[in-house]
């Protein structure tokens, strides 16, 4: 006898034990059914029973079946280890997957395996067996039995294996930023287009009956426990953990007496202020926590994190830990290992043979590397001076998400890759280039020490993933993505930030965003769990410099949360809404009808959306090729004596600006300025800025505006990184403690 039922979207085959069934284990039974059934109909789990529960009328009691079915993904009757290697490896799998009943025939992907678990598995195998395996080894040997054989046949070697030790004596000495941190730090400087914003994340939590004093005490205990909550970034680009910091005070605003509309206005104003903050990095703290008391028992917690020091896992971990400390009244002891120890350990990797091998792997592909998706833009990046990110969000229910994960398992790809493939499928409908590169954000903690997983910090790594429009159907394209990503993840010693520098050199796009379409997977890291937080999530948004669109996926309470954070000003009105509807619609369809993955003509969009996409891509038009300085000269010829500029110190006509700008142009040419060479404008706001910019353009050079209020070290960094040798200054600015500028050739603009 047999019954098939469903729990959270998983197909469960329940059978009364018979001789013909007892001889099967999970792997063999699945293999047999795979030969008889379409892939999407093969049950994911098998539950053997002595007797099927029935109702009084003799029919099968399906409700009781679901209650009897245990929440393990693995089967109850499983194949046990037969060798020492299998036994040790099985223990590792149980630890990583969190299941006790795992057999040596159980499938890695069916258990929920992904690339993050694979990374940890590689580390554990190296510790236990003293051999090096790769992600490809795991994905080609998806059972304990098969992987154990691969381990036994591998070479026992430990070259280039790094371990780190806590250095307590130098714990508060400066240390370098990681490559990703440094990219974030430069991105906020304004040196690049779509810069001038911090890498930032903002949360709002609604809490009932919050004790604000206890919340503040708990937050301060976390500050004592985690060194990176006491970090600053010095003007020279080094970071430093402070040994001691003042008691952090959480500002509490009481709006209980306000009318409903006034309360909403006050909360909106606070969100507008905090959701896109650019926190000063050379001053502590690099976070901002406030509380609004809305009613006697209702509070809203506002949390602003600078992601240059906290990655996604770290933020979720802090929110979990904050609530735990709040309820228990105490925090665990400070961690011996520090993020400084970890970063210095990463620096050692650059001197290994693995780094040189991975560098060659990536640099050999630079010349043929695919561009980012070429999406229709309403504006050029350079036209946006202050970008604001907007969020679109959707959710897959527990049942839908489990169904999608099961579909990924049957396809033998990770859930992240399946989501990434659906994202790419959507982008391809709007992008003019069908082969493109996505920028993947990952939280990769290299297991250099047992305490690494207890640290908070920015462990973010980036991977540039080329996605080809190859394959007859969605399933084939998804498996191709899995294959490419698997290969790429075996060459992570050389980072994507370094690769982007090489790509910028190839394209000549030194100031623009080169890979601005991002996919961020939070799967496999600490889940969003509102039950563990101080309050229920009310709102959340993130931003990153030089990013157009960032798609983030995270699990919360068994559901899948989907977020698109985007610079909407870049795109045509309504376009991103249509794209997001197409994407989420595909995922909902996949959850109900996973068989469409095999269809050659599967369509993601309705005819209406397809037509709008076609219209959005019709961007061909005739434009006059006019430049900023060319337009000015036209106006100066037409209206030479018309007033063009008014400041508090001077009024100027077009003729006067033109004459003074040509004078500056002549000075630059006499100094040997080259076409498209960068000339810095280092001034307070004033008429001199206008003259300086036109003077530079008339000379055929490019101008680089620098905020005069930036710290000296940052200005010097920008000047050196941009290759600038000439700076235009004002008399008053040049006289104010700027002797250090004498390293460069300076021209003073004065009336």
Give the label of every model feature segment.
Residues 94, 98, 187-196, 241, ...:
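Flexible, P/S/T/G-rich "lid" or insertion loops adjacent to the active sites of thioester-utilizing
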Residues 40-42, 190-199, 227-228, 283, ...:
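His-Asp-centered acyl/peptidyl-transfer active-site segments
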Residues 1-66, 71-341, 360, 377, ...:
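Carrier-protein-dependent adenylate-forming modules in NRPS/ANL systems
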Residues 536-557:
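Low-complexity, glycine/alanine/valine/leucine- and proline-rich hydrophobic stretches
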